[in-house]
Swiss-Prot record:
Keywords: Cell inner membrane, Cell membrane, Cell shape, Cell wall biogenesis/degradation, Glycosyltransferase, Membrane, Peptidoglycan synthesis, Transferase, Transmembrane, Transmembrane helix. It catalyses: [GlcNAc-(1->4)-Mur2Ac(oyl-L-Ala-gamma-D-Glu-L-Lys-D-Ala-D-Ala)](n)-di-trans,octa-cis-undecaprenyl diphosphate + beta-D-GlcNAc-(1->4)-Mur2Ac(oyl-L-Ala-gamma-D-Glu-L-Lys-D-Ala-D-Ala)-di-trans,octa-cis-undecaprenyl diphosphate = [GlcNAc-(1->4)-Mur2Ac(oyl-L-Ala-gamma-D-Glu-L-Lys-D-Ala-D-Ala)](n+1)-di-trans,octa-cis-undecaprenyl diphosphate + di-trans,octa-cis-undecaprenyl diphosphate + H(+). Pathway: Cell wall biogenesis; peptidoglycan biosynthesis. Its EC number is 2.4.99.28. It is found in: Cell inner membrane. This is Biosynthetic peptidoglycan transglycosylase. It comes from the Bacteria. GO terms for biological process: cell wall organization; peptidoglycan biosynthetic process; regulation of cell shape.
Length: 244
């Protein structure tokens, strides 16, 4: 009887601990959604993950680096390039591209070895800022919930600004300011259309693809992005959607 009561007390304590831990995490996410709707983002969850992973591997020279800049300090071509590459419907959806999701599901049923994603810029930003890499249903479920909250509270311009400041462009290189200075020795405000398209071309896998040593695939993707940028209307597209 004593063992039963002790065991029951332990289970109740563990249950309370789990519930409280979940509530703390949810509270932290809600606070992050509110605070980062106007405050600069000092670091992201992916940056922390990369840094800790490097230390655990003994790679003490690795430093996850980013420099926050406002949208006014980012070349319009860079904002247009990431939308052309990753999410051309970004101004119009509420965080999810249902057509792209449907196409990805059909593709993945036929091609189990080459999985296609359908994440919008909003989802990618949420994953980078609050969550972790991976394709688990748990992470995707959390991503969907947080993305909904972000879309309700933030403007599209804010989502794009944060995305551009925390996106990974290479080992230890996070955000367009750090990428522009590392690869082109200039601030993000002076990036050309070609340079912007090259940076956007590595976004699917910035560890495998390098802007400073682009493969033939990256170069082809860069040229495709440039064509898409022209078809979208260039700066006029940004102005029409209040994104510049």
């Amino acid at each position: 009887m004593k063992w039963s009561r002790g065991r029951g007390g332990l289970l109740a304590w563990l249950k309370r601990l789990i519930v409280r831990s979940v509530l703390v995490v949810i509270g932290a996410w809600l606070a992050g959604i509110l605070l980062f709707s106007f405050l600069p983002v000092p670091f992201s969850a992916v940056m922390v993950d990369r840094q800790i992973s490097a230390w655990l591997k003994g790679e003490f020279s690795y430093v996850a680096h980013s420099d926050w800049v406002s949208m006014e300090e980012i070349a319009p071509e860079m904002a247009l390039a990431v939308m052309a590459a990753e999410d051309q419907k970004f101004p119009d959806h509420w965080g999810f591209d249902l057509d792209a999701i449907g196409q990805a599901l059909k593709h993945n049923e036929r091609n189990t070895q080459r999985i296609r994603g359908a994440s919008t810029l909003s989802q990618q930003m949420v994953k980078n800022l609050f969550l972790w890499d991976g394709r688990s249903w748990v992470r995707k479920g959390l991503e969907a919930g947080i993305t909904t909250g972000v879309e309700l509270v933030w403007t599209k311009r804010r989502i794009l600004t944060v995305y551009l400041n925390i996106a990974e462009f290479g080992p230890g290189i996070f955000g367009v300011e750090a990428a522009a200075r590392r690869y082109f020795n200039k601030p993000a405000s002076r990036l050309t259309a070609s340079e912007s398209a090259l940076l956007a071309a590595v976004l699917p896998n910035p560890i495998r693809f390098r802007a400073n040593a682009p493969s033939s695939y990256v170069i082809q993707r860069q040229q495709w992005i440039l064509r898409q940028m022209r078809q979208m209307g260039g700066d006029a597209f940004l102005r029409a959607n209040n994104l510049n």
